[in-house]
Amino acid sequence: MTKILVIDDELEICKQISLILSKQGYEVTYANSYKEFSDLEQRNFDYDVVLVDLWLKNSTKQGIDIIEYLKNKYENLVIVSFSGHANIDNAIESVKAGANDFIEKPFETKKLIHIIQKNLLELKQRVTINNYRNKISFHSKIDTIG
């Protein structure tokens, strides 16, 4: 089962997203602040997708900080950023920080699900390609020994 972490300072948004995605068969957890995210991350981080709001009120760090941290620490993770104060600069900044995609709040359920599914498929394809590359590289090394 695909595990998703939602990070947003608005509890109702977290609950709504959790309900929507749970109905789609995803296992969803949420955090309302950087501190809650940090606590979850330190315990056992085994998520496939992280949805992160760019602007977290009353937090020591913002969504961009979380994106950069996650991208540097976890190679095979889908990160989707979102914001209710969206503009093209926010989208570009979040992708430069390491997000796979960006969605503007409020968003339609279908669009959110599509973005998650699309990015999970792309991740699966990248992992498969990398596995094949590693196998080819390994066999090439064996062929050249001696």
Where are these predicted regions, by residue range?
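Two-component/phosphorelay signaling modules centered on CheY-like receiver
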Residues: 11-30, 35
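Acidic, metal-coordinating helix/loop segments flanking the phosphotransfer/catalytic sites
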Residues: 30-49, 57-58
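Short amphipathic alpha-helix used as the core "switch/output" element in two-component signaling
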Residues: 60-76
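C-terminal output helix
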Residues: 87, 107-116
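The C-terminal output helix
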Residues: 117-131
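AAA+ ATPase active-site-proximal loops
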Residues: 133-146
